[in-house]
Every structure is written in C-alpha cells, then in structure tokens.
Amino acid sequence: MRMKRHKIRKKRNPGWYFLLPEFLGVSVFGLIPFADVVRRSFFQTVDGSFVGISNYVQVIKNDAFDLAAKNTLRFVVTCIPCLLLLSLILAMLLQQVLILAEKKKKHRDVTMEQFYRGSAAALKSMYLLPMAIPAASVVVLWKILFDSHGFVNSAIHALSGMNGIGKILSVLLVREVDWMNTDAAFGILVFSYVWKYLGYDIVLWMAGLSAIPQGIYEAAEMDGAGKWKTCFYITLPNLRPVAFTVVILSVLNSFKAFREVYMVAGSYPQENIYLLQHVFSNWFQTLSVDKMAAASVMLAFVIAVFVLLLERSWEREE
C-alpha cells in the first residue's frame, strides 16, 4: 500500500523535477546576488560597519542621482508611449497586408498575392534590421550623423546657400555643432531607442494579432461594422494580454539605452542624457559599492511596484 502511494506521489509531481534546474539557476544568478546587494546597502564599504539607512539617505540627497533619476523617468515616459503606439500601428498595417495576401490567394490572384507578400517581407526586413545591428555600429552611425563634422552639419551647410529655409539655417547654425552636447541630445536618444526596439515590439504585437480569430472580423463585417469599430471593439480588447507583456519588456529595454550613450559620450555626457546607469558606472569606478547597492535596491523596488500596480490594474479591468 505504501509503495502504491509513493508511486502516485511521483506521478503527481513530475513538474518539480523540471522546475528544479530553472529554480537553481534563478537562485544562483538572481536571488542570491540580489540578497547580497540588499545586505551591502546597509553596510559601509570601507570598514564593513553597519550604517542602517545612511546609504539610502546619501543616495537620495545626491545631486547626480537626482538628475539621473529625473532624466531616466523623463526618458521612459517619453519613449514608451511613442514606441507602443508606433509599433502597434505598424503591426496592424503588416497584419492587414498579410490578410490581403491570403484573400488574393483564395481568389487565385497570384500577381497581387506575391505583391502583398513581398511588401510584408520588405516591412519585416526594415523593422528587424535595427535589432541585428551591434551597439558599436550604432555608435559609429551616431558619430557619422551628429558629430561636429558629421553628416547633419554638412547637410545644413549645404542647404545654407539656398533661399528660404537655407538662410534661416545659416543664421541659426553659424558654426559646427556637436549635437550630442546640446539639448537636442535627448531627442536623439529617444529616436535611437524607438528605432532600435521598434521591431522587437512589432513582433510581440504580431503574435497577439495572429491569435485573434479571423471569424470574428468576418462576423463583424457582415453586421456592418467598419474598420474603426472592429479596431476599437475587437482588436484592442483582444490585445490586452499581449499589451501587458509589451509594456513591461519595453520599460526593461529602455534601461539598455545606456550602452550607446556611454560609448559616444563617456561617463559624463550632456546633462539631459545623464541616466541612472551613468551614476552606477561612476560609483562603481570609485568603489562606492554601498551607494550603488542602495540605489540598486531603490530602483528594483520602484520597478517592482510599477509592475505590481500595472498587473493589478490589468486584472481589475479584465
């Protein structure tokens, strides 16, 4: 009897054996290091003495951290809505092109089917290309475009000899401008991030769009629903589960913009693009591990609260 119960337990819990390696990996490379970071945030780096919340107070009062936190928040608030809206529009456009290709296939219109499929393939190549470009290549592109002797300045000087807008540009730009050291640097950073991760979000939106049954659209079309009504009452409500994932991943990806900025402008870039990662990098170089640990815990707490609130609001509306 005991042998039978033992066999039943083994059959009931086979999933734990598959989850164990994953749990060990997350613990070794995630949970345990984070617990050590939390511990270090309450101790001084030099002598290892316990200082309580002193490190947190120093971080909050630090001017560099305050500037970086404001810039990072501004960057996320600006980038995420632009990225989500633009990627959703392009994903819906691409989905419509694929639907038209399927309709032409049913009507045996080979020429138009090939045209639509070719257009879809061209769109996919355009939005997936930035994902394949290494960060070092993006940095080279930035320097070619926005350096004081780069393409943008050359183009403006070429236009300065023309009438109208050329004269205006010649008045505004009397010398070569290093665009990454001006207020325009923030806009360049936003554009670069959206350009880099646009394809990533389009792929996620496409996964959600392809999961919506086409029969719903056909039934709505038979009932006289137009494109706008099907978009607002069918497409967007069915994309809610995917939207949660897209928002979270987009926010996490926004912290990866530091690589390009650091490689272009170094540890102390123009103040509008001085991000939290710059603070962490500078503190790491000066071995201020206690401050860096406290700031990391604070950032992790803010992100966790944001994710929980977002998840709660999603569940409440569903």
At which residue positions do the language-model features occur?
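A structural signal for multi-pass alpha-helical bundles of membrane permease subunits
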Residues: 8-318
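Short Lys/Arg-rich cationic patches that frequently serve as NLS/NoLS or arginine-rich RNA/DNA-binding motifs
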Residues: 1-9
